[in-house]
Amino acid sequence: MDDAPIGWIREVVLNARDPLALAEFWAQVVGGTPTEWYDGWVTLEPPPHGQRLSFQGTDEPPVATTVHVDVLVEDLLTAHEAVIAAGATYVEERWSPRPGLDRKQVPWRVYADPEGHLFCLVVR
């Protein structure tokens, strides 16, 4: 049996009514430079530590999704203020058990980007 993968994840693509505006929001959150390849398709080239994101134009209304982006941060409160200033909407705070750590639970927060895609800020 061959253990080689079928392929690799090239990028994560988010549908957007305004792909460039959404790419600019995400550039503030995770870094990178938005590049508009053609009308309705914008790619956010990541810094060396990031994942490539692309934004595909659509006229369809946003729908609930089962996929979201987790953003690793050093300081939750500082990151919270920054994503709110960039245009995110705070949804809720949750706590997760972290086996092996002195503290029993670690907080993370859920947000919506300007087009309604959910994402989380997770403490490093």
Region annotations inferred by a language model:
Residues 30-66, 118-124:
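Conserved short beta-strand elements that form part of the metal-binding/catalytic scaffold
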